[in-house]
Design a protein with these regions (language model features):
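N-terminal substrate-binding region of glycoside hydrolase catalytic domains
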Residues: 75-83
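PAPS-dependent sulfotransferase catalytic core
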Residues: 1-71, 77, 195-196, 205
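Amphipathic alpha-helical segments that form well-ordered structural scaffolds
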Residues: 17, 21, 96, 152-163, ...
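Short, well-ordered alpha-helix to beta-strand connector turns
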Residues: 70-71, 101, 167
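The conserved 3'-phosphoadenosine-5'-phosphosulfate
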Residues: 33-43, 107-121, 158-205
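PAPS-dependent sulfotransferase catalytic domain
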Residues: 23, 58-65, 84-181, 186, 190
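Short, flexible loop segments at the rims of nucleotide/cofactor-binding pockets, characterized by
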Residues: 49-57, 82-86, 149
């Protein structure tokens, strides 16, 4: 099965919930990086970051998905460990995906901007990395306050809305909405047997 869905949402937007729901629906999901159990130890991609594979394809053959065969969905694409790589913010990469794969569906998971900003604060050293590394729309030195992170978050989803317009292949999905699983299932043409909260912050209420 060729890849069917790419999530363009930011970290802490519900990417793990999305990935878990898709896995339980029978899809093979790459979330952030390629895990050993997904390759059987016989694949050079083992341990590779999804972000790096997307750019390897884009700047190799022109197809961002060239090195992601065998997967049905990408639930988180950015990288902020060691390097700062953000495919979901890259117009050229998104346009290459749309042109090369006309049947590909896109989703942008999101939550309330303040909730996302606070979740980033509580998750490991994410805010320290955000402020230290250059991130598209959030230069190094910014992102320490919730207000700055919220401005960046809102700007990202406004960017995606401007890029896709009324393209039916794109769905902005509030993962906390009661109809989220129904909307996502309809978008993909599948039934989702589970929807909930995965990878929750231990401090969250």
């Amino acid at each position: 099965m060729s890849l069917r869905l790419v999530n363009l949402g930011l970290p802490k937007s519900g990417t793990t919930t999305l990935g878990h729901a898709l896995k339980l629906a029978g899809l093979r999901v790459a979330d952030y990086r390629i895990r050993p159990h997904q390759t059987g130890g016989r694949d050079a991609r083992e341990g590779a970051f999804v972000a790096d594979l997307l750019y390897r394809g884009l700047y190799g053959s022109g197809d961002p998905l060239a090195h992601l065969d065998g997967f049905d969905a990408l639930s988180e694409t950015s990288r902020l460990r060691g390097r700062s790589v953000w495919p979901q913010t890259d117009f050229a990469l998104i346009e290459a995906l749309r042109a090369r794969h006309p049947g590909l569906r896109f989703v942008a998971t999101r939550r309330d901007a303040f909730a996302m900003a606070q979740s980033m604060l509580r998750w490991s050293d994410m805010v320290a990395r955000l402020t230290r590394m250059p991130v598209p729309g959030l230069p190094a030195g910014y992102g320490e306050t919730a207000a700055q992170r919220m401005r960046w978050i809102e700007g990202h989803y406004a960017f995606l809305a401007a890029v896709f317009g009324d393209d039916p292949r794109y769905l902005e999905l509030d993962v906390a909405a009661t109809d989220a699983p129904l909307r996502l299932g309809a978008h993909l043409g599948i039934d989702l047997p589970w929807w909930g909260t995965a990878n929750a912050n231990p401090e969250s209420t």
